[in-house]
């Protein structure tokens, strides 16, 4: 999965897919009532990127729905996975549940079209703070109570704060998420800084073990050719990047073209890939 980073305006969906992304990451900010308000990152953000692009969440979700609904004039077949980077910093552990409930209701209305012919992409709820695990509980409960529990088959979970893996596993369990139940594990840092692959290697080892909790592992945010090669050699499942074309180029190199391929809609993002 080539994951286009910080896609917060609708026009950027086409921009990143045209560069080779089959997945995008979108930042979601919340108002004082725990309601998702904007697709917006703000400062600081990655080097060489403009931090202030934004849409109203409802508008972005409708644009995203069109881009991922077969038959729509805006449909992009390649776009199969969306990571919502949830900026829950202004939520408390007590309002996180409400935030998750309201975000599920918003996705149901504006992205899934009330459960009728909505967008088809898989969704990852990515939360930076393990203390906000109740966001996941609220999200899941809202879909169940609305009679759309079936949509949870399209939803995965990630804690993105580079916490201890056992602590993340515990937070997932508190949220009601079982081991390997659609669990993506991220590791990374802004492209302005360097980061070792130590935790990536630890997460990959967990993913590949008989008693791990991780389904897939992705690394963010990289675009240097050497770093991309190192990440692929570490056997990650996804790479988040500002330059999808760089990842495409590396995948086409002799040492990788027979080991990796781009994921398609037929590849289940929740299944452990047996190497």
Swiss-Prot record:
Reaction equations catalysed: an N-(acyl)-sphingosylphosphocholine = an N-(acyl)-sphingosyl-1,3-cyclic phosphate + choline; an N-(acyl)-sphingosylphosphoethanolamine = an N-(acyl)-sphingosyl-1,3-cyclic phosphate + ethanolamine; a 1-acyl-sn-glycero-3-phosphocholine = a 1-acyl-sn-glycero-2,3-cyclic phosphate + choline; a 1-acyl-sn-glycero-3-phosphoethanolamine = a 1-acyl-sn-glycero-2,3-cyclic phosphate + ethanolamine
Regions crossing the membrane: none
GO biological process: killing of cells of another organism; lipid catabolic process
Keywords per UniProt: Cytolysis, Dermonecrotic toxin, Disulfide bond, Hemolysis, Lipid degradation, Lipid metabolism, Lyase, Magnesium, Metal-binding, Secreted, Toxin
EC numbers: 4.6.1.-
One GO term describing the cellular component: extracellular region
Cofactor: Mg(2+)
Tissue expression notes: Expressed by the venom gland.
Compartments (UniProt record): Secreted
Residues given in the record as Mg(2+) binding sites: 25, 27, 85
One MF annotation (Gene Ontology) recorded for this entry: metal ion binding
Cysteines joined through disulfide linkages: 45-51, 47-192
Free-text remark on how the cofactor is bound: Binds 1 Mg(2+) ion per subunit.
InterPro entries: PLC-like_Pdiesterase_TIM-brl (IPR017946)
Catalytic residues identified in the record: 5, 41 (nucleophile)
Chief place of localization: secreted
Function noted in UniProt: Dermonecrotic toxins cleave the phosphodiester linkage between the phosphate and headgroup of certain phospholipids (sphingolipid and lysolipid substrates), forming an alcohol (often choline) and a cyclic phosphate. This toxin acts on sphingomyelin (SM). It may also act on ceramide phosphoethanolamine (CPE), lysophosphatidylcholine (LPC) and lysophosphatidylethanolamine (LPE), but not on lysophosphatidylserine (LPS), and lysophosphatidylglycerol (LPG). It acts by transphosphatidylation, releasing exclusively cyclic phosphate products as second products.
Similarity comment: family membership: Belongs to the arthropod phospholipase D family. Class II subfamily.
Name of the protein this chain belongs to: Dermonecrotic toxin LamSicTox-alphaIV1ii
Species of origin: Loxosceles amazonica
């Amino acid at each position: 999965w080539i994951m286009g980073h910080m896609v917060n305006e609708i026009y950027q969906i086409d921009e990143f897919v045209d560069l080779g992304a089959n997945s995008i990451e979108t930042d979601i900010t919340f108002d004082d009532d725990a309601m998702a308000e904007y697709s917006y990152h703000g400062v600081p953000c990655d080097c060489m990127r403009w931090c202030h692009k934004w849409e109203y969440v409802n508008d972005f979700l409708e644009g995203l729905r069109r881009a991922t609904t077969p038959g729509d004039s805006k449909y992009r077949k390649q776009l199969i996975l969306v990571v919502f980077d949830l900026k829950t910093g202004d939520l408390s552990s007590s309002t996180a549940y409400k935030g998750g409930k309201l975000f599920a209701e918003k996705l149901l209305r504006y992205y899934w079209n009330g459960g009728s012919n909505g967008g088809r992409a898989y969704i990852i709820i990515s939360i930076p703070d393990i203390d906000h695990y109740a966001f996941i509980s609220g999200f899941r409960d809202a879909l169940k109570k609305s009679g759309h529990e079936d949509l949870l088959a399209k939803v995965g979970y990630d804690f993105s704060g580079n916490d201890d893996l056992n602590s993340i596993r515990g937070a997932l369990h508190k949220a009601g998420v079982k081991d390997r139940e659609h669990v993506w594990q991220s590791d990374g840092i802004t492209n302005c800084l360097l980061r070792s692959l130590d935790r990536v290697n630890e997460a990959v080892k967990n993913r590949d073990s008989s008693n791990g909790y991780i389904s897939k592992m992705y690394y963010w945010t990289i675009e240097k050719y050497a770093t991309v090669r190192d990440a692929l050699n570490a056997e990650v499942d996804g790479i988040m990047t500002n330059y999808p074309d760089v990842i495409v180029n590396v995948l086409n190199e002799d040492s990788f073209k027979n080991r990796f391929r781009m994921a398609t809609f037929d590849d289940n993002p929740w299944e452990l890939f047996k190497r």
